[in-house]
Amino acid sequence: MLSVEELSCVRDERVLFDNLSFTISSGELIQIEGHNGAGKTTLLRIIAGLGRADSGQVCWKSEGIESAREDYYQDLLFLGHQTGVKRELTAYENLAFFQAMHNESIDQDMSGKPPVLGDESLWQALAQVGLAGREDVLAGQLSAGQQRRVALARLWISNHKLWILDEPLTAIDKQGVKVLESLFLSHVERGGIVLLTTHQDMFADSNHLRKIKLGQ
C-alpha cells in the first residue's frame, strides 16, 4: 500500500538516513523511532510529499506519489507540528471548515458506507479531545495545547485512509492518550494506516504496534 524505496536524505552535510526501505500494509500502525535529530520529522514530511529526499522514492498503491499526487492527497491526512488551526475561527468552525474542504474525499468511509457527519459529529469530536464547553471560543484565544486538540479532533471526522501524525500526543494527558490509542486501533481495524512519531510509550500490547528505528 505505502512503500519507501531506498530513500536517502542529507541535511547540513549530515546523513539522516541512507537507502531506507520499508513497506506498510493496510491495517498497520507504525511508529518511527529515533533520537532527536535522527530525521523523524523529515521522513514524515517526505512521505507526506512536503519535503524532498536526495534519492529514492515514496509509492502509494505501487505508484510514485509525485505522479499519483491527486489520489494520494485524497487518501492522506497529515498533522505536523504546525496545527493548521485558523485563529480567527472558533474551535467548532475550524472543524466545520475542515469537513467542508474535504467533503469530496469523505463521501464514503473505507467500508463503502456513508460516514455519519454533520453538526453532532463535530461537537462529539471536540468532546473527545476534551474541548467540551470550548467549542465557540476563538482558536486564537485557546492555549497552544488546546489548539493542538482542535487539530486532533479532525481525526474523528476523517475518512482518509492514511494518517501521518508528527508527535500527536504532545501536551495530551494520560486519559487523552488512551482515547487516541483507541481511535488509532479503530482506524487500522477498518483497514486504515497510522504512521506516527511520539516520545510517549504506547500500547502495553506491542502486537498492536510496529516500530521503525532511525539512526541505528
Curated annotation (Swiss-Prot):
Residues annotated to bind ATP: 34-41
Top-tier EC class: translocase
EC number: 7.6.2.5
A single GO BP: cytochrome complex assembly
Keyword Nucleotide-binding attributed: yes
Predominant location: membrane
The keyword GTP-binding is annotated on this UniProt entry: no
GO cellular component, one term: plasma membrane
Keyword line: ATP-binding, Cell inner membrane, Cell membrane, Cytochrome c-type biogenesis, Membrane, Nucleotide-binding, Translocase, Transport
MF annotations from Gene Ontology: ABC-type heme transporter activity; ATP binding; ATP hydrolysis activity
SUBUNIT field: The complex is composed of two ATP-binding proteins (CcmA) and two transmembrane proteins (CcmB).
Protein name, as recorded: Cytochrome c biogenesis ATP-binding export protein CcmA
Species, as recorded: Photobacterium profundum (strain SS9)
